[in-house]
Amino acid sequence: MNLSAKTVVVIAIGAALYGIGGLPMFGIPVFANTTLKPAMAVLALFSVLFGPLVGFLVGFIGHWVTDLFAGWGVWLTWVLGSGIVGLIIGLFPSLTRNRLEKGDFNMKDFALFVVLALLGNVFGYGCSAFLDTILYAEPFTKVFTQLSIIALGNTILIAIVGFFILKSVAKRNKQSRNLTEA
C-alpha cells in the first residue's frame, strides 16, 4: 500500500480530531462504558470526503488515540469497530459517483449517507460487541445494549451534523466549479 503525502496528512489530521474529540470530556455518557461522541461527525466527514481507506484509518487510529488519552486502556475490539464504521461510510463517494465533489447533494444522497452510517455503526460496533463476548467474556446483554445505544445514537448524530456539513461542502464545491478566469 503506497499512500501519498496528502493522504497521510489527511489521515493524521482526521485521526487527531477524531481521537481528541472522542475523549469523555467531549461526549455524553449514556450507559456503562458507553459515550455518544460528537467526534463521530468528524469520522463521517473524513470518510465521505476521502473514501473508505482514509475512513478506516481515521476511525482505527483516532479511536486508539481516544483510548490512550482516556486512560482506560486500548480496547482493540472497539478500535476495530470505529475503523469499520469509517470504511463503510467511506463507500459514499463511489456509490454516489462523486456527486458531492461536483456540488450535488440531494435527499437521495442524504438517505444513502444515513443508511451507510447506520450500517457502519451496526456492523462495525456489532463486530466489537461480538468480539467482546468472545475475547473478554463480557456479558452479551451488556454489549448488545451498548451496541444498540451507540448504533442508534451515532446514526442520529451523524445524520444531523452530517446533513449541514455535507450541504455546505456541496455548496462550496458547486461555487468553486463555477469560477472563471477574467
Swiss-Prot record:
It comes from the Bacteria. Keywords: Cell membrane, Membrane, Transmembrane, Transmembrane helix. One of its GO terms (cellular component) is plasma membrane. Its main location: membrane. InterPro entries: ECF_substrate-spec-like (IPR009825), UPF0397 (IPR022914). It is a multi-pass membrane protein. The chain crosses the membrane at residues 8-28, 41-61, 72-92, 110-130, 146-166. It is found in: Cell membrane. NCBIfam families: PRK13661.1 (NF010182). Belongs to the UPF0397 family. This is UPF0397 protein VIBHAR_05109.
